A protein has these predicted regions:
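Flexible, polar/acidic helix-loop-strand segments at domain edges
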Residues: 137-219
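Acidic, mature catalytic/reactive cores of soluble proteins
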Residues: 161, 236, 294-297
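Short, cationic low-complexity segments
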Residues: 105-131
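C-terminal structured "cap/appendage" subdomains that terminate the fold
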Residues: 244-297
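Active-site-proximal region of nucleotide-activated glycan assembly enzymes
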Residues: 227
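Structured loops at beta-to-helix junctions and adjacent beta-edge loops in soluble globular domains
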Residues: 88-91, 108, 122, 126, ...
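Structured, solvent-exposed acidic/aromatic patches
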Residues: 1-112, 184-187, 201-219, 232-243, ...
């Protein structure tokens, strides 16, 4: 995998020169960063310097800059999102499936929720998946609650805390009590919405299938991989650099700094650790197919 991907970095098209959803050499750099970051865990060889090298290349080349709003990455018009390096295309008309982002929307959605928040699938949700308490608690308590007059979380500090909580319990199950299989046990995650950045449905009442492309590779992950590689000893990186990468991600999440006038979510050098990064990856990358790998690493 590594040798072929390294060869492809010189064969694939220049950044942004390929047609949409086809990989270019930035995708190859990203894949190498991810493989090298996990090399010690799966192969017993420390490759953190190479992980840092390729993650930084993704960032420094600047071809896929961070989106200005975290929430825009997971919407029906995310084909215009600057951050997505390699998307898996979904289309309500031409790529209909119960899998992909159609599942990610409907599995967390149920009929009564449509009275409060538009996810672009109408009342077609299945209500068969909920998030665990351990994940919800990675966000500040004030950011965990859904308010009917703020369905996009504009008034939250961390805009990544996208939960639906009305008439739902936080716990999916309480020890010592009988397990009840209902969609009100546990909060729903409304990160994925089949609507546009203008917060409009593609058609009135929503579509049967999703048009939200799945971001298989995106730049924010490169920021977090670079930071982690540095903390794990990558040669050439500095602690200040790692802190800068993490705070850039948090600035965007909090819509602060160059992203807006929200309350700052920045951390100090003393707060940055591998444990913090693991939690930050959960906050940033949840439901994007990386958590199991992160936990094993």
């Amino acid at each position: 995998v590594v040798s072929e991907t390294e060869e492809l970095t010189g064969l694939l098209k220049e950044p942004k020169r390929n047609e949409y959803a086809r990989v270019d050499r930035v995708a190859a750099w990203f894949l190498l960063a991810r493989v090298y970051l996990n090399a010690e865990t799966w192969g017993g060889k420390n490759e953190y310097t190479n992980a840092y090298k390729y993650a930084k290349k993704v960032i420094a080349e600047g071809n896929y800059p961070l989106a200005s709003d975290y929430r825009h990455i997971f919407l029906a018009d995310n084909n215009t999102c600057s951050e997505i390096i390699w998307p898996l295309v979904q289309d309500a008309d031409y790529a209909q499936s119960s899998a992909g982002t159609n599942f990610l929307i409907k599995a967390l959605m149920n009929g009564p929720m449509d009275n409060y928040v538009k996810t672009g699938v109408g009342s077609r949700g299945w209500g068969n998946a909920r998030v665990k308490v351990a994940f919800v608690d990675k966000f500040d308590e004030a950011d965990q609650i859904f308010y009917a007059d703020d369905t996009w979380g504009d008034n939250k500090k961390d805009k990544r805390a996208q939960f639906f909580t009305i008439d739902h319990t936080k716990e999916t199950w309480v020890e010592g009590k009988a397990f009840q299989k209902t969609f009100e046990n546990g909060y729903a995650c409304i990160k994925w919405r089949n609507v546009t950045k203008e917060r409009k449905e593609l058609v009135e009442g929503g579509t049967k299938y999703s048009s939200v492309d799945f971001p298989m590779f995106r730049t924010a992950d490169a920021y977090l991989m670079a930071a982690e590689a540095i903390l794990r000893g990558a040669v050439g990186g500095t602690q200040d650099e790692a802190l800068g990468y993490v705070n850039e991600i948090r600035d965007r999440a909090y819509m602060s700094g160059k992203y807006g006038d929200g309350a700052s979510g920045r951390i100090t050098a003393g707060e940055l650790s591998l444990d913090f990064l693991l939690d930050e990856r959960a906050r940033e990358m949840h439901m994007e197919l990386v958590r199991r790998t992160d936990l094993i690493r």
